[in-house]
């Protein structure tokens, strides 16, 4: 999980989701997991 100021999709399988007011990227590739912090 990378915590970044600006999250974006890295590949086509990445999905942007809003959880508890935070934007999260989930993907089949675990290296693409990101959270806005």
Curated annotation (Swiss-Prot):
GO biological process terms on file: translation
UniProt xrefs under InterPro entries: Ribosomal_bL36, Ribosomal_bL36_sp
Annotated localization: Plastid, Chloroplast
Residues spanning the membrane: none
Entry-linked SUPFAM superfamilies: Ribosomal protein L36 (SSF57840)
Broad class of the protein's primary localization: plastid
Keywords linked to the UniProt accession: Chloroplast, Plastid, Ribonucleoprotein, Ribosomal protein
Disulfide pairings: none
Single GO molecular function: structural constituent of ribosome
Any Pfam family hit: Ribosomal_L36
One Gene Ontology cellular component annotation held by this UniProt entry: ribosome
Family: Belongs to the bacterial ribosomal protein bL36 family.
Name of the protein in question: Large ribosomal subunit protein bL36c
Organism from which the protein derives: Oenothera argillicola (Appalachian evening primrose)
Gene transcribed to yield this protein: rpl36
């Amino acid at each position: 999980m990378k915590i970044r100021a600006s999250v974006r999709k890295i590949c086509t399988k990445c999905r942007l989701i809003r959880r508890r007011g935070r934007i999260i990227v989930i993907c089949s590739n675990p290296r693409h997991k990101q959270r806005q912090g």
